[in-house]
Design a protein with these regions (language model features):
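Short amphipathic alpha-helix segments
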Residues: 298-306
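Basic nucleic-acid-binding interfaces
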Residues: 326-328
Length: 348
């Protein structure tokens, strides 16, 4: 039995052994960005920093007491890369495409991992064992190459996932995910200065059986298709969409999803709008005449399904991601769905 004591912030804890990787998200009250990011440290301080991961403590519990499982960094960077690549969809919500991808340019280079996220956006993942001041600039260099060589990436997607996936790549919202032992406060500031979608993700091993991921900073690039969603000012009247009751309901759903927490990103596709943290937690389809369909990442088997309100769509084709379908017709339905929306948000 494992007991988690978490004073603040969120992350994902997974068991790194075998193909049946179990994962869950741990979520508590939010911290400020400054509180979650450790000050810069040198190579000589790495050992001291291994136990400092935003106050997270993991305990092994028995009838006779508890034993703390000390966090540690990977022995080598490749250990982290191999683990994440083997379970990238579970850990990051990204379909793995290629490892150590050699780019064809004058200066050369190898992209650690290439992938495609749930909404079809290209993803570059870079790894560092500890703290590395150059990881963001290195990733941005690779992203610039990627956006200038779309055919190469499109061919890779076609070879791995087929022609349909290759034709639906979301080029307006490429992403960079940096997975490292830690980041400095300067890193967190730097990502805000770039007009790109960047996630800084901190990792730790806990003993030999557990592996933790924690998003410490997330910034979305300025584009029409993928933009950081900001909550409306307190007391300001909601801005309603044109198009009748269902359009107004869609706007109300948008306000609720945005209000679930800081750092929510809306990615607009033709068939749906995805709301994500590191991964999607809700997808909202365009309003129908009498109802609005919302798809969540909640497990339908853990929900009391109600005919005409919730439906298990596991294995069924639909736009967006998620196995639980919500059918909303009124704002009262939206109120009923509150717990399910929060459950899906926490799982992302």
């Amino acid at each position: 039995m494992w007991d988690l004591l978490i004073p603040g912030n969120r992350g994902t804890l997974v068991r790194p052994g075998g193909s049946d990787v179990a994962s869950h998200t741990i979520f508590t009250g939010p911290k400020t960005l400054a509180e979650t990011i450790l000050p810069p440290f040198g190579v000589g301080d790495l050992r001291a920093e291994e136990g400092k991961v935003s106050g997270l403590k993991l305990f092994h519990t028995t009838n006779s007491g508890v034993t703390e499982v000390m966090p540690r960094l990977a022995a080598v960077e490749a250990d982290v890369q191999d683990l994440v690549e083997a379970h990238m969809e579970t850990m990051l919500g990204v379909t793995f495409l290629a490892s150590e991808y050699v780019i064809d340019c004058v200066d050369g280079g190898r992209i650690d991992s290439l992938g495609l996220d749930e909404n079809g956006a290209p993803v570059i993942v870079e790894y560092k064992r500890g703290t590395d001041a150059g990881v963001i600039n290195q990733g941005l260099y690779y992203m610039a190459w990627l956006t200038n060589h779309k055919d190469a990436f499109r061919n890779l997607v076609r070879d791995r996932l087929g022609g349909t996936a290759a034709s639906q790549i979301l080029w307006s919202a490429p992403r960079l995910i940096c997975v490292a032992g830690d980041f400095t406060r300067y890193d967190a500031h730097a990502v805000r200065e770039h007009r790109r979608s960047i996630d800084l993700v901190r990792y730790r091993y806990f003993g030999s059986d557990h592996f933790g991921l924690e998003t410490v900073a997330s910034v979305t690039g300025h584009s029409a298709s993928a933009k950081r969603v900001r909550r409306r000012a307190a007391g300001a009247p909601p801005v309603r969409m044109q198009g009748g009751a269902m359009a107004e309901l869609a706007e109300a759903v948008d306000e609720v999803l945005v209000g679930l927490g800081d750092g929510v990103t809306r990615v607009q596709r033709k068939q749906y709008a995805a709301y994500q943290r590191l991964r999607n937690f809700a997808c909202v389809c365009p309003p129908q005449q009498k109802k609005l369909l919302v798809y969540l990442k909640a497990d339908p088997k853990e929900v009391d399904l109600v005919s005409g309100f919730t439906r298990d769509v596991t294995g069924l084709g639909h736009h967006g991601t998620g196995d639980l379908e919500l059918q909303l017709r009124t704002e009262r339905d939206l109120e009923r769905a509150g717990d399910l929306l929060r459950l899906s948000y926490a799982a992302a």
